[in-house]
């Protein structure tokens, strides 16, 4: 077949849908997306190709390409016959990478926003097209590394082992857990005692409501709260802040909703969103992995799990539905699955070094899985340790940086009981409890601990049932005080040796130097917010015993 190599210097040439396989880039792609016939043909491929899913739809590609026009350069390799689209491979590359970088990565459309990537082709062209497309791409951009993850089940991959391709490809299998709503055993899952116990516990806490959100205004109104929950957990676990770092993700989520590509459900307690799943959907499949959140403040009641089961129960009303729990090796997904299939990760490159590295990674991941360890978790743990040590090395010569929290000895001589008084001075700031937006304003710069460590500590504290009171100013977190009570004390081996379940213990403190003069007022304001029932006590290290001199509410514990 005839091949047309697109010039990097002339990306704006008139688009020509020639016979055979052609590569289109940048403005050429946007011209294709404005052609109704091209979109109709793409849509036809989307519905007819047996491995296709919502991430392969023209609607998804248009949303991503148009929202991230400045960040990513679109590439489409397409095959035409008699003016009709027969196959295509939608891709993207970081903006300007082609012109500015010696080597660069080309990824499937959607980058890390897409759970699945790959190509579409009419029957009989599934293998011949992808080999032509990749050969054309590597000829046009010889130093490119092509990354496709995950390739869906049923997509042909046997060609990778052919002599012409085996030295240029690194292929990795990933199991994919599924919940098929047609499975006759599925109803038993909704009756499990562990689920019913968690559900009833939440119901006793207040008015619990599970609902699907289909109204655009309601979806737009709730999206900021979900973005906060998502960024908070992603920041604590992976040091990622998707919405905070790139507000365009909000634009993408709105565009996908408008395109009918999202299935949105929330779980609320007394009107507050405590869990959500915003999943990409299409062709009777729902793909977990868009936005999956829960409130850390209510984590002790497992709202995320309860929401997941309620969603599965709702989907089970249509036996044609499949709930894709997505690849990745998560243990909890494997426990919930009723079926499994295989997806793939694929790297293609002219570089022997890149392929050897890719194959070594495959062997490492397989070794981790055999040992019962999740590869991405192992990699993340190493990355976190390196991140922390790099930060500490940077701060070796710096003095006076505030600690994330003090660590006083849990001894009676460090315990002070607090007399709660009604007189509370007017403060120039507002004290908030478990306020994710303020906690996300902790920055590594100017602190002993990294932001990653801080968010992890905040999250785990709330998941234990503790409260984190905080105050921010000028887009920076100024101070925090941790308060433990009830079961949070009982579950703590250290605190339970000195304190009882009825106590409210203020026991960890964080303060920026510029806020120290106001910290006493912050402390007193928190005391005023606490319930009268029970005893309020403070566990003070030497760094914070200045509070005793500044306030008259203390007495020996």
Where would I find each of the regions flagged by the language model?
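Acyl-group handling in specialized metabolite and lipid biosynthesis
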Residues: 120-123, 184
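A generic secondary-structure signal for well-formed alpha-helical elements
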Residues: 46-53, 141, 230-238, 315, ...
């Amino acid at each position: 077949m005839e091949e047309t190599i697109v010039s990097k210097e002339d990306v704006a040439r008139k688009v020509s849908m020639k016979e055979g396989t052609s590569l289109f880039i940048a403005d050429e792609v946007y011209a294709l997306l404005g052609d109704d016939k091209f979109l109709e043909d793409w849509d036809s491929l989307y519905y007819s190709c047996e491995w296709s899913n919502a991430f392969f739809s023209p609607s998804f590609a248009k949303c991503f390409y148009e929202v991230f026009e400045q960040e990513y350069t679109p590439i489409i390799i397409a095959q035409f016959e008699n003016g009709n689209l027969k196959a295509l491979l939608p891709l993207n590359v970081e903006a300007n990478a082609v012109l500015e970088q010696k080597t660069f990565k080309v990824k499937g459309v959607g980058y890390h926003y897409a759970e699945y990537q790959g190509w579409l082709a009419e029957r009989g062209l599934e293998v011949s097209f992808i080999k032509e497309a990749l050969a054309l791409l590597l000829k046009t951009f010889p130093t490119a590394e092509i990354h496709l993850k995950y390739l869906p089940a049923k997509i042909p991959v046997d060609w990778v082992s052919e002599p012409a391709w085996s030295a240029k490809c690194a292929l990795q299998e990933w199991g994919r857990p599924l919940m098929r709503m047609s499975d006759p055993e599925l109803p038993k899952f909704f009756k499990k005692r562990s689920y019913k116990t968690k559900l009833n516990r939440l119901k006793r806490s207040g008015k619990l409501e599970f609902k699907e959100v289909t109204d655009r205004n309601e979806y737009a109104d709730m999206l900021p709260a979900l973005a906060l929950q998502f960024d908070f957990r992603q920041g604590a676990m992976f040091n990622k802040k998707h919405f905070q770092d790139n507000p365009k993700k909000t634009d993408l989520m709105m565009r996908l909703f408008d395109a009918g590509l999202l299935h949105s459900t929330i779980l609320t307690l007394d009107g507050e969103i405590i869990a959500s799943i915003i999943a990409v959907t299409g062709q009777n499949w729902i793909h977990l992995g868009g936005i999956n959140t829960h409130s850390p403040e209510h984590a002790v009641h497992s709202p995320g799990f309860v929401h997941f089961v309620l969603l599965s129960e709702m989907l089970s009303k249509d036996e044609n539905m499949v709930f894709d729990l997505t690849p990745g090796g998560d243990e909890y997904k494997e426990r919930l699955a009723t079926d499994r299939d295989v997806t793939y990760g694929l790297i293609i490159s002219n570089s022997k070094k890149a392929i050897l590295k890719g194959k070594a990674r495959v062997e490492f991941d397989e070794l981790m899985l055999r040992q019962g360890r999740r590869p991405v978790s192992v990699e993340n743990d190493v990355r976190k340790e390196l991140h922390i040590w790099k930060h500490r090395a940077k701060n070796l010569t710096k003095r006076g940086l505030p600690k994330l929290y003090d660590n006083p000895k849990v001894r009676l001589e460090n315990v002070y009981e607090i007399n709660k008084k009604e007189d509370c001075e007017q403060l120039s700031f507002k004290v908030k409890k478990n306020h994710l937006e303020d906690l996300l304003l902790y920055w590594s710069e100017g602190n002993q601990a990294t932001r990653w460590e801080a968010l992890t500590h905040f999250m785990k504290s709330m998941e234990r049932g503790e409260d984190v009171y905080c105050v921010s100013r000028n887009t920076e977190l100024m101070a925090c005080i941790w308060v433990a009570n009830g079961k949070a004390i009982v579950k703590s081996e250290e605190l339970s040796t000195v304190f009882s379940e009825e106590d409210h213990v203020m026991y960890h403190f964080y303060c920026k130097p510029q806020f120290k003069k106001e910290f006493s007022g912050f402390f007193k304001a928190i005391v005023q917010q606490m319930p009268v029932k029970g005893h309020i006590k403070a566990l003070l290290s030497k760094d914070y015993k200045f509070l005793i001199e500044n306030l008259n509410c203390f007495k020996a514990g």
